[in-house]
Amino acid sequence: LMIQIYNPENTDFEKNGNMTLFPSSATVNAKISGAWEVTLEHPLDDEGRWKYIVDNAVVKMSSFNGEQLFRITHKEKSESEITADLQPIFMDSKDDCFLMDVRPTNKNGQQALDIMTAPNKKYSAKSNIADINTAYYEKMNLIEALNSDNENSFLKIWGGEIVYDNFTVVIDKKAGSDRGVEILYGKNVAENGMSEEV
């Protein structure tokens, strides 16, 4: 269970990160269609691995849906450890995928999402929703268009449940229950080091 960290300017996530982390704990709490709470705690180790835990760095670690990328949004240091809050990397689309005037018209879920993610080829989407609907997105980012209070948001019009999978968002009729994964490190941990609560 390698946890890799990538410096903020490093976007080559296919390769190993700038450093391997050995956190004391890493938790992914995935609320279906809600906020994902991701927390990482790391000792202030002599090798200085902890110094790589900076705002906007990206951490690659195992989650309930395979290896996932999370971006650090906040960090706090105490005398003995550093704690970081992270979010799925798909949330980057708040800042780099804008829908200026996008109108999926008489489209099913997949067709609508293909149109909505088109402004930035970095992102993609998958959906099994067959319902045909129309929506209108003007001057909003992709996250707002997918899941916000806006009456045109994808979830309000097509329904479904959101799961983030790196640069892909999966919105299916039923995604399952809220998932939580705690990844623990140290000597007294099972082989794969993962405990999963559903």
What are the residue ranges of the model-derived segments?
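Leucine-centric amphipathic alpha-helical interface motifs
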Residues: I5, E197-V198
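Charged- and aromatic-enriched interaction segments used to assemble
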Residues: S80-E197
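A structural signal for short, hydrophobic beta-strand segments that form beta-sheets
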Residues: P23, I72-H74, V189, S195
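Hydrophobic beta-strand residues in large extracellular and virion-surface proteins
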Residues: I3-I5, V38-L40, V59, I72, ...
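Juxtamembrane "anchor/assembly" segments of surface/extracellular structural proteins
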Residues: L1-Y52, Q87-S93
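Short, acidic/charged, Gly/Pro-enriched secondary-structure junctions
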Residues: I3-T11, D45-S78, R103-A118, N152
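Short, ordered beta-strand-loop transition motifs
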Residues: T27-W36, H74-I82, V163-F167
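Short, solvent-exposed secondary-structure boundary motifs
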Residues: D12-L21, V58-E67, L146-K156, A190
